[in-house]
């Protein structure tokens, strides 16, 4: 079985590791990831969004199936093109990927099909209408560009924006730049990640995870792609009740069903970013692929073959998935200055043997084959154990064997940081 993987981040290194166990791996990506390269039978350098070139390599190698890692090629219709040319592909079509690539579409779908967990929203193309709506609304808002932003274009009043006046100014900028802007009510609470496999009908849950999007310890600093994440051995999170879990899963199931009814069936991995609000989990946004870092929480403990699951997804015959009852902690290492002004081209020193001795795993990301940093998150160290405390200890021990002009968040997955989140939920719910 020959499988094509598109992408070369930490997420894709985790995908590559599990695919390579059961298939011959072929890769197309924008840079040569050293962790993926050693798993691949062949590796071509090309822009991941250059769909005709990706197709050329897929046909040249005679792959039996393709797996798309990042979101940008999905927006370009890579799944449509590969499938039209006889390559079954795990991932949504361009139309279905709009759940991620067009935030207004996602909000419209939830409203149209009365999907639980939806938020109050409005799309504007007129500056004065937008300003008067925000004034009339009178409560804090969230301002979002409609398209892909790498998780960094969304601004929230009380966080990146001082007040609704600043929100109006930012929204005006976006209307002038993009022609439209999405304004939502601000939802307060604690965020979590719920990823599922789906063949367009059946939805199979993965363990819940929680991401640390802020650059610095204590949840401060600029928003990043994610500085780390954790998951628990019971596959839930310490502040999530069984009822919260069921409601969030129902939102994802209802979304897949709505996509089918809408004539844009969704297959692949669906990622729900939820805010656990006072009354119920609310959708912050959807992603049309695995999370990065959250792929590294779930894939290393997946007991079934990802190749088999992929085949079932493309055949519309998804049977299920099973995960080890283990806790995981992912800690990302980033170049100094990330995300605003990162150092580049500086070599990292990674003692893989020592990392393995600590019981940890390493997944490479924005790093070339000579271990020079390319400007984004460089690599992740993952601890896996029977308890969260032990998984965090392993990840912290492993990360000590990486040297260079780097930083990471020491508080990812720690008892103290999780206790803060539990306390927030209790206070919000008056417990």
From Swiss-Prot:
Mg(2+) 2 binds at residues 285, 287. The keyword Hydrolase does not apply. One of its GO terms (molecular function) is metal ion binding. InterPro entries: ATP-grasp, ATP_grasp_subdomain_1, PreATP-grasp_dom_sf, PRibGlycinamid_synth_ATP-grasp, PRibGlycinamide_synth, PRibGlycinamide_synth_C-dom, PRibGlycinamide_synth_C_sf, PRibGlycinamide_synth_CS. Mn(2+) 1 binds at residues 273, 285. Binds 2 magnesium or manganese ions per subunit. Keywords: ATP-binding, Ligase, Magnesium, Manganese, Metal-binding, Nucleotide-binding, Purine biosynthesis. It comes from the Archaea. It holds the Pfam family GARS_A. This is Phosphoribosylamine--glycine ligase. GO terms for biological process: 'de novo' IMP biosynthetic process; purine nucleobase biosynthetic process. Belongs to the GARS family. It catalyses: 5-phospho-beta-D-ribosylamine + glycine + ATP = N(1)-(5-phospho-beta-D-ribosyl)glycinamide + ADP + phosphate + H(+). Signal peptide: none annotated. Residues 107-315 form the ATP-grasp domain.
């Amino acid at each position: 079985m020959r499988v094509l993987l598109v992408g070369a981040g930490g997420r894709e290194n985790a995908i590559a590791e599990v695919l390579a166990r059961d298939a011959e791996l072929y890769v197309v990506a924008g840079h040569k990831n050293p962790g993926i390269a050693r798993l691949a039978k062949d590796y071509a350098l090309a822009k991941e969004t250059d769909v005709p070139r990706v197709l050329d390599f897929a046909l040249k190698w005679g792959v039996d199936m393709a797996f798309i890692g990042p979101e940008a090629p999905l927006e370009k219709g890579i799944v449509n093109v590969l499938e039209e040319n006889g390559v079954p592909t795990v991932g949504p079509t361009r139309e279905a990927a709009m759940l991620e690539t067009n935030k207004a579409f996602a909000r419209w779908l939830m409203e149209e099909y009365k999907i639980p967990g939806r938020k109050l929203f409005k799309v504007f193309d007129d500056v004065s209408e937008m300003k008067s709506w925000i004034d009339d609304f009178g409560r804090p808002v969230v301002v979002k560009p409609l398209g892909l932003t790498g998780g960094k274009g969304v601004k929230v009043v009380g966080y990146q924006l001082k007040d609704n006046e600043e929100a109006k100014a930012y929204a005006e900028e976006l209307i002038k730049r993009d022609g439209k802007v999405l304004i939502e009510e601000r939802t307060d609470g604690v965020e979590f990640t719920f990823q599922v496999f789906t063949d367009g009908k059946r939805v199979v849950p993965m363990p819940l995870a929680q991401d640390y999007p802020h650059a610095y310890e204590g949840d401060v600093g600029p928003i990043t792609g994610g500085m780390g994440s954790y998951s628990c051995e019971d596959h839930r999170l310490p502040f999530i009740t069984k009822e919260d879990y069921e409601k969030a899963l129902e939102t994802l199931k209802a979304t897949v069903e709505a996509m089918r009814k809408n004539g844009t069936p969704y297959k692949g991995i669906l990622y729900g970013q939820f805010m656990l609000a006072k009354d119920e989990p609310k959708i912050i946004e959807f992603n049309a692929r695995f999370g990065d870092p959250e792929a590294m929480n779930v894939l290393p403990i997946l007991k079934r073959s990802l190749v088999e699951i992929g085949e079932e997804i493309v055949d519309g015959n998804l049977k299920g998935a099973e995960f080890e009852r283990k806790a995981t902690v992912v800690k990302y290492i980033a170049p100094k200055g990330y995300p605003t002004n990162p150092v580049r081209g500086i070599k990292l020193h990674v003692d893989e043997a020592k990392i393995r001795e600590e019981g940890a795993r390493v997944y490479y990301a924005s790093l070339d084959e000579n271990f020079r940093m390319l400007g984004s998150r460089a690599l992740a160290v993952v601890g896996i154990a029977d308890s969260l405390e032990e998984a965090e200890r392993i990840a912290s021990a492993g990360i000590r064997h990486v040297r260079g002009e780097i930083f990471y968040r020491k508080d990812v997955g720690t008892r103290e940081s999780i206790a803060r989140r539990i306390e927030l939920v209790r206070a919000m719910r008056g417990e």
